[in-house]
Swiss-Prot record:
Record keyword Ion transport present: no
InterPro entries from the UniProt entry: P-loop_NTPase, RapZ-like, RapZ-like_N, RapZ_C
UniProt protein name: RNase adapter protein RapZ
Pfam families in UniProt: PapZ_C, RapZ-like_N
Assembly and oligomerization: Homotrimer.
Name of the gene: rapZ
Species annotation: Yersinia pestis
Length: 284
């Protein structure tokens, strides 16, 4: 497991980096005192979770020896890595002017320029032992997040998770949906007394819907639409794409179609999840 320590001058992008690491599955803590690093790592060791912690000038130890000692106290299962973010002086000044935020050292009655310079001196012990230094002067927020994914995961884009969820319109449209498809016009197994108690996961219902050409046409056109735009969605700095399929009650048609779409994209190597809102409510 990795303990990623994120540091750098204020305004260089530590918060952006921490959010990107969280998207990559790291357990993230902002501004944790250095002396608590071993305790955090020990807590997470049994859960097999990598962690990322930001350290700025406000929680820097008084001497480098304190930091070194904390590193020696980490569980053997954790491999510490130090990421240091920086930007040139003019860029940091411009970013502070744009956001109108106070520098952490402004309480010492320093000018912004002096605060930036003093912070550089205070953080030098961390910078000198960094495993990776990234200059964010010419980077946008998205470019920084992309670079971290490339460096840490070895691939350019994060893996998009496709979520296919069924629902019933009479229960309301899911608020987390990126796309909503209405399948209430498809043949309805509800009107067959034998199929009515079943769901779209049961073989008799699957066989019923599988006999209808219009069902296959809808699934084909929907998956073709998603396939056409999926490459752009994957590069749009998002973690999830939620596709909601709705029928009247969320029990038969929407469940079947959601499962068919999920199976199709799963077979093509995509990271896919499926869930059925109405069926989950019935289990509760």
């Amino acid at each position: 497991m990795v303990l990623m320590i994120v540091s750098g001058r204020s305004g260089s992008g530590k918060s952006v980096a921490l959010r990107a690491l969280e998207d990559m599955g790291f357990y993230c803590v902002d501004n944790l005192p250095v002396v608590l690093l071993p305790q955090l790592a020990s807590t997470l060791a049994d859960r097999n979770i990598s962690a990322a912690v930001s350290i700025d000038v406000r929680n820097m130890p008084e001497s480098p020896e304190v930091f070194e000692h904390a590193m020696t106290q980490l569980p053997d299962s954790f491999s510490p890595q130090l990421l240091f973010l920086d930007a040139d002086r003019n860029t940091l000044i411009r970013r502070y002017s744009d956001t109108r935020r106070l520098h952490p050292l402004s309480a010492k009655n320093l000018s912004l320029e002096s605060a930036i310079d003093e912070e550089s001196d205070l953080l030098e012990p961390l910078r000198s032992r960094a495993d990776l230094i990234i200059d964010t002067s010419e980077m946008s927020v998205h470019e920084l997040a992309e670079m971290l994914r490339t460096r840490l995961l070895g691939k350019r884009e994060r893996e998009l998770t496709m979520v296919f969820e069924s629902f019933g319109f009479k229960h309301g449209i899911p608020i987390d949906a990126d796309y909503v498809f209405d399948v209430r016009f498809l043949p309805n197994p509800h009107w067959d007394p034998k199929l009515r108690p079943m769901t779209g996961l049961d073989k008799p219902v699957i066989s019923f819907l599988d006999r209808h050409t219009e069902v296959h046409n809808f699934i084909y056109q929907t998956r073709s639409y998603l396939e056409q735009w999926l490459p752009m969605l994957e590069t749009n700095n998002r973690s999830y794409l939620t596709v909601a399929i709705g029928c009247t009650g969320g029990k038969h048609r929407s469940v079947y179609v959601a499962e068919q779409l999920a199976d199709y994209f799963r077979a093509r190597g995509k990271n896919v999840q499926s869930r059925h809102r109405t069926l989950e409510k019935r289990k509760q």
